[in-house]
Amino acid sequence: ASELASHAVDACILALPNGHAAACVDSLVAGGADPVIVDLSADHRFDDDWYYGLPELTRDRYDGQKRIANPGCYTATALLALYPAARAGWLPDGPVIIDAKSGVSGAGVKPTDTTHFCSVHGNLSTYNVGHKHRHVPEIEQELAEYSGHACRIVFTPHLLPVSRGILETIYLTTPPEVTLEALHACYSSQYAGEPFVQLLPLGQGSTLAHVVNTNRCTISLHSAGAPGEFIIVSVLDNLLKGAGGQAVQNMNIMFGLPETMGLE
């Protein structure tokens, strides 16, 4: 971190392990410098002085800030899937169940016994079962902000034997008068004109193939067979819309450039 103080930079994207970004920020602003900083770690996601960088949901919070906290990859997948329902007042008081699956790159670059090829190939496993994953408080905080009431998440992450991509199956209970067509219309209206959110037509399902190597989140909506019960399938590439691509999108916003620059 000390080496950064000798470099005058206009912008910096920090892709460091959790707990290491704060020292680098201090070095970057040493001597009165004020660069644009996007932090991909979890260090500043709960800091009110940092803009929470999921612009499809938080554009109204952006007011020229030069510090952006990138959302977590699981978090972005879940929030994009639930935001329209939250805004419409359709999130339940009870828990929302999220069954999440991620490619191995979501576990980081350091090999472990559980992420080694021999452990992952031909296998499917859970980890951080319960309320343990660090993205759970982040999801709950943002959903409470959008819905106006506390939201509890039951979240189970799984490790997929693929290199990249996240697929979340989300079980949503709304007021019984909400129909699948009404839910789809709500999502269609919310994401109209968003270049990086794709809402599939009813009857189609989201797959990793829709999003791998793109900065796009693809969402499909399904009936669970009873009034007000729905299944949402949300997918994105954890290395792009869930990390580096989202950082570029945020950097574009901070410099007044088209959000899609470098990402199409």
Predicted regions and their residues:
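C-terminal substrate-binding/catalytic lobe of Rossmann-fold NAD(P)-dependent oxidoreductases
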Residues: 1-7, 15-16, 93-100, 104-232
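N-terminal Rossmann-like NAD(P) cofactor-binding subdomain of oxidoreductases
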Residues: 1-123, 127-129, 148, 222-225, ...
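Predominant activation on well-ordered alpha-helical scaffold segments within soluble catalytic domains
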Residues: 79-86, 136-140, 184, 188, ...
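NAD(P)-dependent Rossmann-like dehydrogenase/reductase catalytic/cofactor-binding core
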Residues: 216-264
